[in-house]
Swiss-Prot record:
InterPro entries reported for this sequence: VapB_antitoxin
Domain of life of the source: Bacteria
Name assigned to this protein: Putative antitoxin VapB17
Keywords from the UniProt entry: Toxin-antitoxin system
Record function comment: Putative antitoxin component of a possible type II toxin-antitoxin (TA) system. The cognate toxin is VapC17.
Amino acid sequence: MTVKRTTIELDEDLVRAAQAVTGETLRATVERALQQLVAAAAEQAAARRRRIVDHLAHAGTHVDADVLLSEQAWR
């Protein structure tokens, strides 16, 4: 793991509230929040992929081949 040192401005009340919930240091609290953000984004992407795969798997049942093959389909 590569460590990046940085200076950031944080809302002190929010920091105290977060640390009261986690019982952790500021660094650990920020790392936990970043991990949760990344995990949530990954889950959202996975859910989107599942919805797309499900849609494509059932797309054929929603197509009327007779209409597509008729001359009126492309008017």
